[in-house]
């Protein structure tokens, strides 16, 4: 099994999992917006447009991943999950080719200075240090996309109860 947590969220209850099952933070049900607009409110929407274009190049127009990013209201945030290693490998096979193509398309060359320059150039927000983490925000949406479309997500709430 493999687990990822960020500094603000910790999955304290975990157990053996079947293939295709993932423990996550509780999904956010967005009644008033969709993933695409949620991203647009706080980040550079052209990053999302690039990502969906890359996904369409890889998986074809109208694929389930692009449909999720453009239309879905359920968001599994924070990049917190526990899953079997085989499922993690599949997630990586989905995620990293998209991020690598995004990096190349935007001439970032995996160089932090280039990310800062990009944030200054195309961000409508004053907090460049926040916006320069574009790949992290994009990754969070892509991980949510993959888990939502390919796996059964189980949320473990701090009381130890599960919500599906």
Where are these regions (language model features)?
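ER/Golgi luminal nucleotide-sugar-dependent glycosyltransferases, focusing on the catalytic module
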Residues: 1-164
């Amino acid at each position: 099994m493999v687990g990822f947590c960020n500094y603000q969220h910790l999955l304290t209850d975990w157990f053996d999992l079947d293939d295709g099952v993932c423990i996550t933070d509780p999904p956010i049900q967005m009644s008033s917006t969709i993933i695409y607009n949620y991203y647009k409110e706080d980040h550079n929407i052209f990053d999302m447009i690039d990502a969906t274009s890359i996904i369409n190049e890889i998986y074809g127009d109208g694929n389930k991943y692009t449909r999720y990013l453009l239309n879905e209201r359920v968001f599994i945030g924070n990049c917190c999950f526990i899953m079997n290693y085989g499922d993690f490998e599949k997630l990586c096979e989905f995620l990293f080719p998209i991020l690598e193509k995004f990096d190349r398309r935007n001439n970032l060359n995996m160089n932090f200075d280039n990310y800062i320059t990009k944030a200054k150039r195309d961000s409508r927000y004053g907090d460049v240090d926040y916006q320069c983490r574009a790949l992290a925000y994009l990754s969070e949406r892509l991980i949510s996309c993959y888990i939502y479309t390919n796996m059964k997500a189980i949320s473990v709430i701090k009381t130890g109860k599960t919500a599906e």
